[in-house]
Amino acid sequence: MDYFPMIFALLFVAFQGAPEAAVLGTELSTGAESGGERPVPTTPWRPRRSKRCSCSSLMDKECVYFCHLDIIWVNTPEHVVPYGLGSPSRSKRSLKDFFPTKATVHRKRCQCASQTDKKCQNFCQAGKELKDQDSMEKAWDNRKRGKDCPKLGEKCLQQQLVVGRKTRRLETISNSIKTSFRVAKLKAQLYRDKKVIYSRAH
């Protein structure tokens, strides 16, 4: 059996399919066509993440769940975590973002991508109002506690520390419960919307 034609064909295919040769060939052909000018290199296309709004803090899980539409939420034994937040494309920031003024200290919970999206506007505004209300309640509680202390002295301060720890723990628990209820509500609403769209399609 003669293997020479098969080996020759394989070598021919290997040398013709070499990437260096192919690249060199394209460079020569484009150079000849354009008269020696180099072609402008094109940047690779990057898919943009679909965002309804951008949160002021990624620690606010409810806001992240509401705003980032393409995040897959993964259930872990401890908590629900977002998957797919890595390197979201964002516009360049101005110097105002790096040096916040007094006017921007009380900013919204999030910033909507579309100004006509009423649901988003309500969500971002409601979050800001809730935060303001919580901070006002905390300040009022602290003021009430401070009135009783001058009478009792050191014992009062120790009691305040214990009460402060307990209240912080209770606040953390209540906040996590509120967040989980809100997330469950949003998930149920999302599921209902998908069901309606699916039933209309079929």
UniProtKB/Swiss-Prot annotation:
User: Under the GO molecular function aspect, what terms does this record hold?
Assistant: endothelin A receptor binding; endothelin B receptor binding; hormone activity
Primary place of residence? secreted
Listed under GO biological process in this entry are: endothelin receptor signaling pathway; intracellular calcium ion homeostasis; positive regulation of protein localization to nucleus; regulation of systemic arterial blood pressure by endothelin; regulation of vasoconstriction; vein smooth muscle contraction
Covalent S-S links between cysteines: 53-67, 55-63
Residues marked Cleavage (site):
73-74
Cite the residue spans of the region called Endothelin-like: 110-124
Q: Where in the cell is it found?
A: Secreted
Keyword line: Cleavage on pair of basic residues, Disulfide bond, Secreted, Signal, Vasoactive, Vasoconstrictor
Q: Disulfide bond as a keyword?
A: yes
Per the UniProt entry, the signal peptide is 1-25
Q: Where is this region: Disordered?
A: 29-48
Entry similarity comment: Belongs to the endothelin/sarafotoxin family.
- Which PANTHER family does this entry report, sorted A to Z? ENDOTHELIN (PTHR13874), ENDOTHELIN-1 (PTHR13874:SF10)
Q: What is the protein's given name?
A: Endothelin-1
| Organism for this UniProt entry | Ovis aries (Sheep)
Q: Which gene encodes it?
A: EDN1
